[in-house]
From Swiss-Prot:
Binding-site residues, NAD(+): 33-37, 83-84, 113, 136, 176, 292, 316
Species name: Mycobacterium marinum (strain ATCC BAA-535 / M)
Top-level taxonomic group: Bacteria
Name this protein carries in UniProt: DNA ligase
HAMAP family linked to this entry: DNA_ligase_A
InterPro entries referenced in this protein's UniProt entry, alphabetically: BRCT_dom, BRCT_dom_sf, DisA/LigA_HHH, DNA_ligase, DNA_ligase_AS, DNA_ligase_CS, DNAligase_adenylation, DNAligase_N
UniProt keyword list: DNA damage, DNA repair, DNA replication, Ligase, Magnesium, Manganese, Metal-binding, NAD, Zinc
Enzyme class name: ligase
One example of a Gene Ontology biological process annotation: DNA replication
Enzyme Commission code(s) on record: 6.5.1.2
PROSITE patterns given in the database record: BRCT, DNA_LIGASE_N1, DNA_LIGASE_N2
Cystine pairings recorded for this chain: none
């Protein structure tokens, strides 16, 4: 081995460890997964050629997070928590299966599981109760994140009883914590709205959310978990992995519904091909298929290396990234005045669709990513996730690139731009009432799916109505007449009559007048008020007038609202032209209060109920609706103000909180009686 080879190994090993630190500890990687995999494979190839380089402390021999100090208390796993080896093509998968065959013959059946792009978590249950949750760490010692894990709805505080599966004395179960795509998008949107940097991808957001110092922050983020393996167990020795999954499910632990048992490598390849085509039909991101030998005895025979089991492998799909030219960086003015830079690029196909634009969030993000106009950039798009510019390909720069300069005046109306308050990352156009860009976005927002969901009132239609001065702002929408629509080319036929689309628009506007109050609140473009907060306000107050009359403190006290949203709502209604929009809509017949169904008895007036666990007779939304329609409040957390907790199968930490505070606990039968008869005289724990 020459000094040059040793130098090359040292450089590669140092790069791998640096990127592992950024990935596992800082949750802020600066290269893509594919680029990291390539670095690791180069290091492995070098060690294959020169085995003396394969020392115990080489990154190829360690689990990803090994050796890094963290801010959480260290905790030892009962059994080592290993990583997985990867296969990137059919040849590597076949070679792995060949090694299995050489060792155990044709007797191995395989489990095929979706490889969720999340963060690994280990749960320990003793006597059926959750006693510890920890991250992977170096495989032997992880970080104690028990308090945060208890806030994840999928993680039961106690295992459920099962007639078919005896509950083990000790159960160490491994799984993946992740964000659903829709929840990830909602989280990033809220971060950007608050002037904070968004997460790069769902995996980073899951890791960052799980490792919050304040469990309340984790609780507000809709993390999910799926269990996919076992560690140490006492009183539980399943013969196969798929039998183990059936037991986990019976005990109330979340397992994937997409796992398939196949007989041979041909079946494995069929699953890999299938999910390669259908990966975006799942509500969370996947980056491959994990293949495992199902027979536990064969697993023990095959054993493991220092970092990964020999009986499992992760087949990884090609990255959903592409390179293209950044032609320009332009800015867009949003409905609340926020000025957002976006990338204008040479169209490129990625993740099954053609991408030509991507948001850059704010000037700070442009600087952080280090992109210049004229750069070749790497973009990423997975399924329905909004396209994202990851960064520049610096080696391809030729000197013609130039920096982006954020404008100082609004590109739509010329008003000087400024942050709303000192320290904000976002800059805004303060001309909120008449800025053409804000007007177009607000009119379009009224028709959006989360607001009043008005078909035929798309971006083009809204712009046409404004440019023809048929409407002055969104307040005029519900007063539109056939004569006014005829003033726009878009809704007029060649014969001068109202087009079919024009008639549909008028009909849809009329239909939208009867929308529930929460949709009206969303449609008003009150900052921070999305469907969740709007539903909470509508449920608590019932009418626009009651919301206007409420103090900021009363608004903030509503579950799911809080002080930031409460202040935004109060401030919005103090603006004269905002109230004019409300009155225009009211005069046009838009419903400003929710109708109460008098046929449903108000048995829960003044009662606050928290539901935890699964109820066979109710979905989560059905249970909440049953409470609200009877005048009660369906809360999301337990406090001294909680009247009752309804505990279904696999209740979470809310059950323990109720016991601690002495809050009455009902089972499903007790819940039904509560709905029918109102509060009973005495309520005990479910039997």
């Amino acid at each position: 081995m020459t000094p040059e080879v040793l130098r090359q190994w040292q450089e590669l090993a140092e790069q791998v460890r640096e990127h592992q630190f950024r990935y596992y500890v800082r949750d802020a990687p600066v290269i893509t997964d594919a680029e990291f995999d390539e670095l690791l494979r180069r290091l492995e190839a070098l060690e294959e050629q020169y085995p003396e380089l394969r020392t115990p402390d080489s990154p190829t021999q360690l689990v990803g997070g090994a050796g890094f100090a963290t801010e959480f208390e260290p905790v030892e796993h009962l059994e080592r928590m290993l990583s997985l080896d990867n296969a990137f093509n059919t040849e590597e998968l076949t070679a792995w299966a060949g090694r299995i065959h050489a060792d155990v013959g044709d007797s191995a059946a395989y489990l095929c599981e979706l490889k969720i792009d999340g963060v690994a978590l280990s749960l320990v249950y003793e006597g059926g109760r959750l006693t510890r949750a920890s991250t992977r760490g170096d495989g032997r010692t992880g970080e104690d994140v028990t308090l945060n894990a208890r806030t994840i709805e999928d993680v039961p505080e106690r295992l459920s009883h099962s007639e078919d599966h005896r509950m083990p004395e000790v159960l160490e179960v491994r799984g993946e914590v992740f964000f659903r795509v829709a929840d990830f998008q909602a989280l990033n949107a809220s971060l950007v709205e608050e002037g904070k940097a968004p997460f790069a991808n769902p995996r980073n957001s899951a890791a960052g959310s799980l490792r919050q110092k304040d469990p309340a922050v984790t609780a507000r983020r809709r993390l999910r978990m799926i269990c996919h393996g076992l560690g140490h167990t006492e009183g539980f020795r399943p013969a196969t992995l798929h039998q183990a999954y059936l037991a986990l499910q019976a005990w109330g632990l979340p397992v994937s519904q997409h796992t398939t048992l196949v007989a041979d490598l041909a079946g494995v390849q069929e699953r890999i091909d299938y999910w390669g085509e259908h990966r975006h039909e799942v509500d969370h991101e996947i980056d491959g298929v994990v293949v495992k030998v199902d027979d536990v005895a064969l697993q023990r025979r095959l054993g493991s290396t220092s970092r990964a089991p020999r009986w499992a492998i992760a087949y990884k799909y090609p990255p959903e990234e592409a390179q293209t030219k950044l032609l320009d960086i332009r800015v867009n003015v949003g409905r609340t005045g926020r000025v957002t830079p976006f990338a204008f690029m040479t169209p490129v196909k990625v993740a099954g669709s053609t991408v030509a634009q991507a948001t850059l969030h704010n000037a700070s993000e442009v600087k952080r990513k280090g992109v210049l106009i004229g750069d070749t950039v790497v973009i990423r798009k997975a399924g329905d996730v909004i396209p994202e510019v990851l960064g520049p390909v610096v080696d391809l720069r030729d000197g013609s690139e130039r920096e982006f300069v954020m404008p100082t005046t609004c590109p739509e109306c010329g008003t000087p731009l400024a942050p709303e308050k000192e320290g904000d990352a976002d800059i805004r156009c303060p001309n909120t009432r008449s800025c053409p860009g804000q007007l177009r976005e607000r009119v379009f927002h009224v028709s959006s799916r989360n607001a009043l969901d008005i078909e035929m009132l798309g971006y083009e239609a809204g712009a046409a109505l404004l440019s023809a001065r048929v409407i002055g702002d969104e307040g005029d929408l519900f007063g539109l007449t056939e004569e006014e629509l005829l003033r726009t080319d878009l809704f007029r036929t060649k014969a001068g009559d109202l087009s079919a689309n024009g008639r549909r628009l008028l009909a849809n506007l009329d239909k939208a007048k009867a929308a529930p109050l929460w949709r009206v609140l969303v449609a008003l473009s009150i900052r921070h008020v999305g469907p969740t907060a709007a539903r909470a306000l509508a449920t608590e107050f019932g009418s626009i007038d009651a919301i206007v009359s409420a103090t900021t403190e009363q608004l903030a006290a509503v579950e799911g609202v809080g002080p930031t949203i409460a202040s935004a709502v109060s401030e919005w209604f103090t603006v004269d032209w905002h109230r004019e929009i409300v009155e225009k809509w009211r005069a046009a017949g838009v419903r400003m209060a929710d109708e109460r169904d008098d046929s449903v008895p108000r048995t829960l007036a003044g009662v606050t109920v928290v539901v935890t666990g699964s109820l066979p007779g109710f979905s989560r939304d059905e249970a909440k609706e049953a409470i609200v329609t009877r005048g009660g409040k369906a809360a999301g957390s337990v406090s001294k103000k909680t009247s009752y907790v309804v505990a279904g199968d696999a209740p979470g930490s809310k059950y323990d909180k109720a016991v601690e505070l002495g809050v009455p606990i009902l089972d499903e039968d007790g819940f039904r009686k509560l709905l029918e008869q109102g509060p009973p005289a005495e309520v005990g724990e479910p039997t």
